[in-house]
């Protein structure tokens, strides 16, 4: 999960963020060609936890495609332990344990994700700063609570898209190992009918893909084909399984335009070979741990892709999971930090307002919009 540093050197004001997004009086100076306006299939919706929106109705601000507002209190403790165990497998004998791993450093406190008043305030601020919609990337095996997210959306006024699926091998329910692909597929269909799921995600691989993770990915691909619900993924750092994930989804018939391969800001490759391959195949590249100290090596990668003509395949978000980044604890951050901290760095590197508006406003709506195939059980 993300950590954060002081970003004040490039942080945008609320007015600057709203201007870039085409909101407020300052937006009049930012022309937008008709060819740049996204189009959506007839009957398409963005499914939020409270209702289905026509995608055009969420065009008044940025959409964050991967954040967290509902995780189990022990999620990061388990996350760190699994990471430490994975590193131990490849660690040379007698080598020191990496800093921050194991039981000596406590994980970030997630109790804020059970504080309705606090998160209501945080999301209301994010909305004022230009965020129109947020995708919660959790699901049951991460401790996501649908009822809690519904309360939070009602109290804050923020449209929230709920994720669905299964996370990664270490977090799978025990029965996944003995279930067939067909049984996993049926479980996903039950999720999609029982809950207002607007995306399958974050779903992924912990490191190199396991047999169970491949099985789950095939089932998720099939569930997408049966529902049209889009997919966003988690890749093991630094993106070892990115292309394999896309291969599996394509092999079962998924059109890549409905897929985001996530955490690719962690893949620091000046040649951007994997990033470009994903764009060329029609999927989105997710830079979704942004708005903090990991931004600097990511900005040149983003600019390389923009300069190569791939702006329409890029998505930004922050994978929010740290109380230190709350507005209450750091006035420079908050849930809008992708927009107010990372995006200004990309603009400073040479990206135009038009391109940034496309990435923050248009692309996520194009990704999330789908024509429902399955009627939900009410």
Region annotations inferred by a language model:
Residues 12-30:
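N-terminal export leaders
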Residues 31-56:
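C-terminal segment of N-terminal export signals and the immediately downstream linker at the start
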């Amino acid at each position: 999960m993300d950590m954060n540093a002081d970003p004040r050197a490039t942080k945008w004001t609320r007015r600057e963020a709203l201007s870039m997004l085409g909101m407020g009086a300052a937006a009049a100076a930012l022309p937008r060609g008709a060819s740049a306006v996204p189009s959506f299939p007839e009957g398409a919706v963005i499914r939020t936890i409270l209702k289905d929106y026509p995608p055009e109705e969420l065009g008044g601000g940025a959409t964050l495609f991967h954040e967290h507002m509902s995780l189990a209190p022990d999620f990061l403790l388990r996350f760190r332990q699994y990471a430490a165990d994975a590193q131990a497998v490849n660690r040379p004998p007698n080598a020191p344990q990496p800093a921050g791993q194991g039981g000596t450093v406590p994980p970030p406190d997630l109790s804020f994700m059970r504080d309705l008043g606090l998160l209501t305030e945080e999301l209301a601020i994010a909305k004022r700063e230009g965020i129109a919609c947020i995708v919660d990337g959790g699901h049951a095996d991460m401790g996501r609570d649908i009822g809690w997210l519904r309360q939070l959306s009602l109290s804050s006024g923020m449209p929230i898209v709920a994720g669905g699926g299964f996370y990664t091998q270490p977090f799978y329910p025990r029965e996944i190992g003995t279930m067939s692909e067909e049984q996993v597929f049926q479980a996903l269909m039950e999720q999609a009918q029982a809950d207002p799921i607007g995306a399958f995600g974050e779903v992924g691989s912990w490191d190199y893909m396991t047999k169970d993770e491949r099985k789950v990915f095939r089932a998720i691909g099939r569930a997408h084909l049966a529902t049209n619900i889009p997919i966003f993924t988690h890749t093991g750092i630094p993106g070892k399984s990115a292309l394999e994930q896309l291969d599996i989804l394509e092999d079962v018939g998924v059109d890549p335009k409905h897929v985001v391969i996530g955490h690719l800001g962690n893949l620091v490759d000046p040649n951007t070979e994997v990033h470009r391959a994903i764009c060329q195949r029609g999927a989105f590249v997710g830079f979704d741990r942004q708005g903090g100290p990991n931004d600097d090596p990511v900005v040149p990668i983003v600019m390389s892709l923009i300069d190569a003509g791939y702006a329409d395949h890029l998505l930004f978000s922050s994978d929010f999971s740290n109380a230190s980044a709350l507005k209450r604890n750091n006035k420079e951050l908050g849930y809008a930090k992708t927009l107010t901290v990372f995006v200004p760095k990309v603009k400073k590197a040479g990206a135009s307002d038009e391109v940034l508006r496309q990435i923050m406003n248009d692309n996520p709506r194009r990704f999330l919009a789908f024509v429902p195939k399955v009627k939900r059980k009410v």
